Amino acid sequence: MVWESCGPAMKRPTLQWGSKPSERGLSSPSSTGLPVAGKESPESRAAVAGAETGSGWTRSNKGGKKTGGALVSATAILIYLALVKLAVLLLTAESYGYYRDELYFIAASERLAWGYVDFPPLVAAVTAFVRWAFGDSLPSLHIIPALVSTGTVVLAGLIARELGGGRLAQGTAALATLIAPTILAVSTWLSMDAFDQLFWTLGAYLMVRILNRDQPRLWLLFGLVMGLGLLNKVTILYFGLAVFVALLATPARRHLRTVWPWLGGALSFIFLLPYAYWQIQNGWPTIEFFGNYSWKVEQDSPPEFLLKQILTMHPVTLPLWLAGLYYLLFVREGRLWRPVGLVFLMLFVLFVVQNGKFYYLAPAYPMLFAAGGVALERYRIGWPRWDRIRVAYVSVLAVVGAVSAPLTVLPVLPVETLASITGTVNGNAGIEAEAREAAQIPLNFADRFGWEEMVASVAGVYEELPPEEQAEACILTGNYGEAGAIDFFGPEYGLPKAISGHNNYYLWGPGGCTGETVIAVNVPRGTLRTVFDDVEEADTVSCEYCMPDENNLPIYVVRSPKVPLEEAWPKFKFYK
């Protein structure tokens, strides 16, 4: 695109992209219309493109001369950013407390299986390994997500490299991935999400490499990554579906005429077979879980979903990922990787239509950051200070990211200070992932508070029971967070293991609990009265910074079951 002069008094900037495939070191289009990469590396192809005067592509080093040596090379910058992220995560690993889901995964790690109601088996297996290798302290649990998320940062830079980007492109892509709040937040606790982001980003890297180098055998490796991803979180199926449709919709469909993508797809589903067998054996509980999903998720209109994308990926990254999307979809030099842009568009639409949580789309952003980094590096605007503007933008990414992270995702501020700031900015700024009342602090922090206080309150009630009732008492909770907390902290207080009807705790059943004496936490009184003749409120759980639905909870002591607890167990079933 060229902006023409607007009269003698004013000369508008010139914006141009190279228009010939040969400028990027590509051969002529194949018979299907898809350009096939030449033998040159992505870096050499980008250099050829940048050599054209007025092409709009600029070299990161003028005249082809290296500046600064290895210490400021693209690889070195990726290493520096990776070390920064790893250091930040490890230094904050012990802050606040155990996240709700971590307590659940710890419980699952003691009951390893090929599947669970609300998640596939990988995260429980990883948790079991971490506890075996490092223990179950907060720093120990947070080592793996820190390493995994650091890998995602590096992969974002490598995607930019594969797209032909140099030092600026790779560093910008990695930096944006580092500071994006949703990506950074899930790096601070052990969960499926950090792994999910890694598998998506690795899949995107392989996809770009396959398209770039015409190496169809890499679809096997792509299938392996998707298979591991399916063992972690089934939403990666959306990514796989989007890749397939994007290939069909572009000249890259020629890959589907080879055996390799089909073998890769078959390989990924082989990984899923044990999980599918577990579903069959247990009556497909995950289907019921997803059927109840809308109860838990905040309902968003398309504009609200888009606004949450902008806010939770950080507003300062908006120009970068929009530039990346534009480059992939509309710029001629990006046509080889057009399927990547289509993947993002389809995922956006799918999650809006399916009412997915806003952070489901987060794993798709590193590939846009990479393309945006290439656009920032290669897109020439005829402004005298454009180079300074580009450097200033990257500096803003770093500074704003460093300032905002402690306020939104990193557990570093004193909780009193965090609560004061949260109140000043009106809670979570309207960003809610779940249909739950907002706390004094954001949900990703609030769900780390109150667990041990709850256990201590239950222990106080337990100690008031006569010895004969203590010997037979069970602890029934309303959700897996409370049950996981009882199981984890309870032994220090001499408490028995918890039972619950929530998600996989329901499948684990009431165990040997007779129901003659039960301490019930956060279970509706009406439900208890349908099962027990004697329902007595004994205490109330209170916590200052926890989620409101975990505060002021009644603790009941119930006795005299109307039927054996095993028979009444379905009344407590809660797949949500």
Q: Where do the protein language model's features map onto the residues?
A:
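Transmembrane-helix motifs of polytopic, lipid-linked glycan transferases
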Residues: I79, I143-G164, L202, L206
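Transmembrane-lumen/periplasm boundary regions of multi-pass, lipid-linked membrane glycan transferases
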Residues: L228, L237-W337, F351, P406-T417, ...
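Loop-to-helix entry region of an early transmembrane alpha helix in multi-pass inner-membrane enzymes
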Residues: P121-A125, G135-V154, G171, V186-L190
